[in-house]
Amino acid sequence: MQVILLDKVANLGSLGDQVNVKAGYARNFLVPQGKAVPATKKNVEFFEARRAELEAKLADVLAAAEARAEQINALESVTIASKAGDEGKLFGSIGTRDIADAVTAAGVKVAKSEVRLPNGVLRNVGEHEVNFQVHSEVFAKVIINVVAE
């Protein structure tokens, strides 16, 4: 199925690209999320007429994401207290929700879906570097300091 992308989509393309995707992917994800429209003659003409407006909107979203990333980077470190054993192993773990709540409490609103834990959940006391994907192109880093209660 041919679609016109209205937003940058990972591993697919960016604004204005006409790409061929499976019908289910287009019907169930791209179109309902507002990331694409079917590539009919009418939609192609409509898109070309609004291209500058859509590019400006995309630039505004990117600028807002970069501003949020700067706020997150400015935090430098966030401390989370959790129960731990003698050897520094936590009872349980610290996941994306706990990290998002701690960063939000520190003053920057973050959704748990933006937290990236490349090595899985945090299970030990100490400092851990955590990435945040604020936008498809914008990343931020914060050091999470896990301390025993």
Swiss-Prot record:
InterPro entries: Ribosomal_bL9, Ribosomal_bL9/RNase_H1_N, Ribosomal_bL9_bac/chp, Ribosomal_bL9_C, Ribosomal_bL9_C_sf, Ribosomal_bL9_N, Ribosomal_bL9_N_sf. Belongs to the bacterial ribosomal protein bL9 family. GO terms for molecular function: rRNA binding; structural constituent of ribosome. Pfam families: Ribosomal_L9_C (PF03948), Ribosomal_L9_N (PF01281). Gene3D superfamilies: Ribosomal protein L9, C-terminal domain, Ribosomal protein L9, N-terminal domain. GO terms for cellular component: ribonucleoprotein complex; ribosome. PROSITE patterns: RIBOSOMAL_L9 (PS00651). Binds to the 23S rRNA. PANTHER family: 50S RIBOSOMAL PROTEIN L9. It comes from the Bacteria. GO terms for biological process: translation. It comes from Klebsiella pneumoniae subsp. pneumoniae (strain ATCC 700721 / MGH 78578). Keywords: Ribonucleoprotein, Ribosomal protein, RNA-binding, rRNA-binding. This is Large ribosomal subunit protein bL9.
